Amino acid sequence: MIISAASDYRAAAQRILPPFLFHYIDGGAYAEYTLRRNVEDLSEVALRQRVLKNMSDLSLETTLFNEKLSMPVALAPVGLCGMYARRGEVQAAAAADAKGIPFTLSTVSVCPIEEVAPTIKRPMWFQLYVLRDRGFMRNALERAKAAGCSTLVFTVDMPTPGARYRDAHSGMSGPNAALRRYWQAATHPQWAWDVGLNGRPHDLGNISAYLGKPTGLEDYIGWLANNFDPSISWKDLEWIREFWDGPMVIKGILDPEDARDAVRFGADGIVVSNHGGRQLDGVLSSARALPAIADAVKGDIAILADSGIRNGLDVVRMIALGADSVLLGRAYLYALATAGQAGVANLLDLIEKEMKVAMTLTGAKSISEISRDSLVQELGKSLPAALAPLTQGDAA
């Protein structure tokens, strides 16, 4: 199969992966409206072409939390990453490290912190949920710090799991789910050999290390369902600061008021995110929410964005809308499932090339030169009408 874009990796991953795993990453919440709008809204952002600008000295390098990045991209935290390729977190981290960008390890990774961190040169980032078991949270923070993790990504948009209807149909949950998963594994031999047999143990390493026993998929579902904490509040940031003194990024911001609160409570960064359309269906796409948030807090806090990014043009669009950097999630997981570390490395090369084309043809020689001036102005506005926030009159 010819691979020329992230969409090719998605098609390849669908053939390789058992359906329960493919649809777990590919699907969203409820009717998946927000999942679709994430991609569609971003694709509607029109770039402003500029020519004859002498673009021979173009650079994608940037700095974030005192870390030098080869381009404004980090790999997002993705749960169960190690089920998509043999020791998947290790392979993805190696690809990010070689490219000179951060890798973020999920709380619910297959490979534990202690397995991934020693395999790469640059410090990785660590993602944490707010859970009822504060002992686990403290344990995870202490282990992340001991392993040299540089930045904490604190996910706040999951006080309760979203309703993901695809999971019941695909075998991730629902009647006879375990039996259906075994059958799917048996009928997908490439995955069964690479991951099913040779990628063991298939437990959640960070949780197993704390509980002192293996955690299989059923344990994962049950433990998380019992531990998500709806009492989460801004005060939890103060508690986390008792155990974490490095940069802290709040992931799951969609409203300017929440962004201002993040500044007020001492966060170092935010991620404008709707969890990839996997939590509350019907909320704004990240592309549509980002401009107002940037207007509210740009310069006061680092702004990252995710959800809907599929190529290098999308990275440039997000930065033009107000982000300092982006997190890449689904796109890299498709590549990982297709070709492991080499797939992720190739995807990052593709994104880099696409960014260079977009920057060359919009006249931006550096990341700092990408702004709303890089977008086509319509009707006297700096943003396309399709992305203008709804007013009460519009909603009516």
Curated annotation (Swiss-Prot):
EC class name: oxidoreductase
Record-annotated FMN hydroxy acid dehydrogenase domain positions: 1-380
Binding site for FMN: 106, 127, 155, 251, 306-330
Membrane protein topology class: Peripheral membrane protein
Reaction catalyzed: (S)-lactate + A = pyruvate + AH2
Documented EC number(s): 1.1.-.-
PROSITE patterns: FMN_HYDROXY_ACID_DH_1, FMN_HYDROXY_ACID_DH_2
One Gene Ontology cellular component annotation held by this UniProt entry: plasma membrane
Alphabetical list of InterPro entries matching this protein: Aldolase_TIM (IPR013785), Alpha-hydoxy_acid_DH_FMN (IPR012133), FMN-dep_DH (IPR000262), FMN_HAD (IPR037396), FMN_hydac_DH_AS (IPR008259), LldD (IPR020920)
Keywords attached to this entry: Cell inner membrane, Cell membrane, Flavoprotein, FMN, Membrane, Oxidoreductase
Superkingdom field: Bacteria
Disulfide feature: none
Compartments in which it is found: Cell inner membrane
GO biological process, one term: aerobic respiration
Residue numbers annotated as active site: 275
GO MF, one annotated term: FMN binding
Cofactor: FMN
Residues that hold substrate according to the record: 24, 129, 164, 278
Family in the record: Belongs to the FMN-dependent alpha-hydroxy acid dehydrogenase family.
Function of the molecule: Catalyzes the conversion of L-lactate to pyruvate. Is coupled to the respiratory chain.
The protein's name in its UniProt record: L-lactate dehydrogenase
Biological source species: Citrobacter koseri (strain ATCC BAA-895 / CDC 4225-83 / SGSC4696)
Designated gene of the protein: lldD
